[in-house]
């Protein structure tokens, strides 16, 4: 079995969705078993925040990781890109409190990763997790679950009153072959951009959120349709929800072999499921055909 890290460092600068502040991110290769973690290089002592479920401190409209009073928010797109492209170990240096939104998708991160390439890292005694019984979390009619399955698959459904979105479903599988999985993620999931509803934007801005949001980095939908077409996919919104789910579940460290099924879910429910998977323990089932 193998892990992977970057063959060279990556640097990106951009504005945060909620803070509206420009930050710089440097992603550096790291040793086998180090995992993915953030370093706040703008603060004394360079505090480290691991990209783990236990570090989640906030889940309203994005996923935030924290350690004490130090935090990094809106981590999900970057973490989805790293995990979807097979980067297990990475030091993510950031000079502010929010990861740049870039174009609202994970495409820029994915292109950067593909450009520098990966380095294989042999691993001994790594035992992956297989889900052997259904694990559910729900709130009202929204839910997310992990079901026993022969492969790692993500399926998502959304439903909005706006005709341009309506009811959408999409399903995507993560093959055990790294090259095929990365290509599939880059083509089918990474390009899907974050989206918002026109009638909610003013309220969110009044509450101090989406200060960095614009028609250049987020799709906006109103009663008459999309304000900034064209879409990259007819079902781009639900594909973006899979992107968010991949990013949130990457906090497990590696994806269990399971079918992750979600409907009208949220970052909060995603993280609740991840925690529940951890609560089951990593010894209730084993598998030997996991790609990480």
From Swiss-Prot:
Catalytic activity: a UDP-3-O-[(3R)-3-hydroxyacyl]-N-acetyl-alpha-D-glucosamine + H2O = a UDP-3-O-[(3R)-3-hydroxyacyl]-alpha-D-glucosamine + acetate
Cofactor(s) listed: Zn(2+)
UniProt family annotation: Belongs to the LpxC family.
GO molecular function: metal ion binding; UDP-3-O-acyl-N-acetylglucosamine deacetylase activity
Name assigned to this protein: UDP-3-O-acyl-N-acetylglucosamine deacetylase
Keyword Hydrolase: yes
Keyword terms of this UniProt record: Hydrolase, Lipid A biosynthesis, Lipid biosynthesis, Lipid metabolism, Metal-binding, Zinc
Xref: SUPFAM superfamilies: Ribosomal protein S5 domain 2-like
UniProt EC number: 3.5.1.108
Binding site for Zn(2+): 77, 240, 244
Top-rank taxon: Bacteria
Function text: Catalyzes the hydrolysis of UDP-3-O-myristoyl-N-acetylglucosamine to form UDP-3-O-myristoylglucosamine and acetate, the committed step in lipid A biosynthesis.
Active-site feature positions: 267 (proton donor)
GO cellular component labels: membrane
Pathway: Glycolipid biosynthesis; lipid IV(A) biosynthesis; lipid IV(A) from (3R)-3-hydroxytetradecanoyl-[acyl-carrier-protein] and UDP-N-acetyl-alpha-D-glucosamine: step 2/6
InterPro entries for this protein: Ribosomal_Su5_D2-typ_SF, UDP-acyl_GlcNac_deAcase, UDP-acyl_GlcNac_deAcase_C, UDP-acyl_N-AcGlcN_deAcase_N
Residues of the signal peptide: none
Biological processes per GO annotation: lipid A biosynthetic process
